[in-house]
Amino acid sequence: MAGLETTPEMFDLRMSEEVRPLFDAVTKFIAEEVDPHTNEFFRLGESREERWGYGEGQLELLDSIKAKAKEQGLWNFFLPDAETGEGLKNLDYAYIATELGKNPIASQSLNCSAPDTGNMEVLERVGTPEQKEQWLTPLLNGEIRSAYAMTEPDIPSSDAKNISCSAILDGDEWVINGEKFYISGAGDPRCKIMICMVQTNPDGPPHKRQSQILVPMDNPGVEILGPCHVFGKDDAPHGHMHLRFNDCRVPKDNILLGEGRGFEISQVRLGPGRIHHCMRSIGAAERAIEMMVKRGLTREAFGKPIASLGKNIEVIAKARIEIESMRRMVLTAAKAMDELGNEAARVWVSAVKAMVPIRVCHIIDEAIQFHGAAGVSQWTPLADMYTSQRTLRLADGPDEVHWFVVGRAELRRWEEEGGIKYDPKADYYSKDS
């Protein structure tokens, strides 16, 4: 499949019957165990004494929910390996991830939140037994959090060949120097490990210069310069941190897969990560339209429900149409990953990554408009939802990179089907024909 072509087997986007009970159990668990405690979780956070910490009882509340989820077997759905996860197909996980996206702490509660999901998948696929024991096991158990350090402040990181943070082998240790910024989750006190993309062979072929190395957060060579703000907020205690590596020494064995294989690992991590983000984004859009409809039916202006005023009913209709269109695109991308593999399906993944966050931002923006000033206040989740989705347009590759991937694939498809020679006159009927 060269581009966004579909084959007959791609049209069956139904959830597997054997996964239906699991999906129902997840939906029920979120409704009964997560939703009722979400406001309390954030309320407890308001009383924290340290900016980069948690309030009294906050983590205990979350841990109690996680314990119930683990006890019921609702844990680590995202991993394709049946031994460490549920062994779900991407298509089946898409339905579950959509439900997770409706609540801001649902993914954490079921140990399916980024960036841990991508890091766990990398460790599960390419980690050594020692790396798995030290880092994958506590991540799978939900005991620690992690970060992924790729973006740098002084280079366009959308082209990963530009990565300049260096790692030089000195005896049995890698010595890392350089800076990373907007490293999500690195401010969380539970974050104990990060996977760092570094340049290990500056003179090698462009796609063989980079490697990925495990760096403990408590390494004395890791300096946290401070949080990078998003729309004026520091997003504490999660945070998007600016890091500096000052002669940061880690064991030689901390390298993942081998020297010069950083790009290869990125494909393991970023492909599934991108589509998982988009799956959860569909859930956020569902939350936004639900809030929009409830507001529209229960608030009156000029003697009428605001849903019936002006073009508001059209706004609701368009939001529903867009959600269902996005849902089908995401499910098709997930199906392509299952049927063709991650590499062959990357055009589909780029398509949904380019489309979904933009449209979800638009739907949330309309929901904000329905709520008036309350829509941008601390009294609704809409402002945070919008910020998250707008940030997603930059995470794991900006929109423009993904538009380029899709457009290039379409051009190549036509070229491969006969070397198109365009004659504008041939595409129009003359009045005399």
Predicted regions and their residues:
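Alpha-helical interface subdomain recognition
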Residues: M1-P104, S113, V126-Q131, P138-E143, ...
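Short Gly/Pro-enriched turn/cap motifs at secondary-structure boundaries
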Residues: D154-S158, G185-P189, P202-G204, V230-G239
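Short Ser/Thr-interspersed hydrophobic loop/turn segments at strand-loop and sheet-helix junctions
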Residues: G73, I96-K102, M197-Q199, L214-V222, ...
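Flexible, small-/acidic-enriched active-site or ligand-binding loops
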Residues: N162, D218-R249
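Long, acidic (Asp/Glu-rich), low-complexity accessory segments flanking structured domains
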Residues: D247-E264
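A short core secondary-structure module
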Residues: D172-E173, N177-L225
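N-terminal glycine-rich flavin-associated loop
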Residues: L110-E130, D159
